Regions:
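Cytochrome P450 catalytic domain signature, combining two hallmark sequence patches
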Residues: 65-67
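Short S/T/G/P-rich N-terminal loop/turn motif that feeds into the first structured element of a domain
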Residues: 1-46, 50-62, 71-97
Length: 97
């Protein structure tokens, strides 16, 4: 599992409305670990993909760019953080393949 971040700078209230609209179009079952963090100056999405190659493919895809454009989100600052060693919730470990 590979973790990356998407940083959107701007009015967090506006960005969150747009993010919620975009996320409504994504299949929830496709999200391995997905977190949206409100900041004073924007939002940051923490997201995982099965591999670094999958993260790069998704984050640079025309489909992702189209999803951003459809709801008026700006191009984010994308950071490929690295491979996840452990992910845990109160329900227990998150499977990492």
């Amino acid at each position: 599992m590979h973790l990356g971040t998407y940083r959107f700078d701007g009015d967090p209230d506006d960005l969150l409305v747009r993010y919620d609209r975009m996320l409504a179009g994504f299949p929830v079952d496709d999200l391995l670990v997905h977190v949206c963090v409100r900041r004073n100056d924007g939002i940051t999405i923490i997201d995982t993909c099965p591999s670094a190659a999958d993260f790069h493919s998704f984050s640079t895809s025309a489909g992702f760019r189209g999803a951003l454009d459809a709801v008026g989100l700006p191009q984010p600052i994308v950071d490929s953080m690295g491979d996840v060693h452990l992910a845990r919730t109160p329900a227990g470990p998150v499977p990492i393949a």
